[in-house]
UniProtKB/Swiss-Prot annotation:
UniProt keyword annotations, A-Z: ATP-binding, Kinase, Nucleotide biosynthesis, Nucleotide-binding, Transferase
NCBIfam families linked to this entry: DTMP_kinase (TIGR00041)
Gene3D superfamilies, per the entry: P-loop containing nucleotide triphosphate hydrolases
Protein name: Probable thymidylate kinase
UniProt-listed PANTHER family: THYMIDYLATE KINASE, UMP-CMP KINASE 2, MITOCHONDRIAL
One Pfam family matching this protein: Thymidylate_kin
Lineage: superkingdom: Archaea
Any GO CC annotation of this UniProt entry: cytoplasm
Catalytic activity: dTMP + ATP = dTDP + ADP
EC number(s) given by UniProt: 2.7.4.9
């Protein structure tokens, strides 16, 4: 089974991914907990570029284009799918990913790139069984991440986050595997809502 958690920053994706992994492990499943960007060379490059707001460009410190950024994310994802996701699924493991190609669609679409081009660029990606979109108002997102020492370009601009949230909700209408979860609820309530959907998927109602 392949499960993805999505949402704007501060929505609680990492927390819920860990809780979900523990739930599966307690039931005897072998779980692979992963994330995007990954820890591959591509992922490390992306993290460096994002954390510096694109100021550490590849050539002479010049900021890379949004198209180049999208291609880097796709390259990292291709390695992720080929080296970890596919082999793990073929081995019968449960794969839980904190972000996946839906993040690229939401963020890079918000940056002005063509959605169809982004979808085509990520067509190679293995489709998850279910995607939990942890939906959170942007003001609450900014409040939650304010205490973090985050320099990510994604987190700097309120307007970008607003567009990204709108895009996620539009994507949820396009991709039936995406299920919207109210991330304003407390951690336990959100977890229980996720588990209820997982049990339905597993036929354990």
């Amino acid at each position: 089974m392949f499960i993805v958690l999505e949402g704007i920053d501060g929505a609680g994706k990492s927390t819920q991914a860990k809780l979900l992994a523990e739930w599966f492990e307690n039931r005897g499943y072998e779980v692979v907990l992963t994330k995007e960007p990954t820890d591959t060379p591509f992922g490390k490059l992306i993290r460096r570029l994002v954390l510096t707001g694109g100021k550490e460009g590849i050539i002479d410190g010049a900021k890379i284009s949004h198209e180049a950024e999208a291609l880097l994310f796709a390259a990292d994802r291709a390695e992720h799918v080929d080296k970890l996701i596919k082999p793990s699924l073929e081995a019968g493991k449960v794969v839980i990913s904190d972000r996946y190609f839906y993040s690229s669609l939401a963020y890079q679409w918000a940056r002005g790139l063509d959605l169809e081009w982004l979808i085509d660029l990520n067509r190679f990606a293995v489709k998850p069984d279910i995607v939990f979109l942890l939906d959170l108002p942007v003001k609450e997102s900014m409040n939650r991440i304010r205490s973090r020492k985050v320099k990510s370009e994604f987190d700097k601009i309120f307007e970008l986050q607003r567009k990204v949230r709108e895009n996620y909700l539009k994507l949820a209408e396009m991709f039936p595997e995406m299920k919207i979860i109210n991330a304003m609820e407390d951690v336990e309530t959100v977890h229980n809502q996720i588990i209820a959907l997982i049990e339905t998927l597993l036929g354990e109602e």
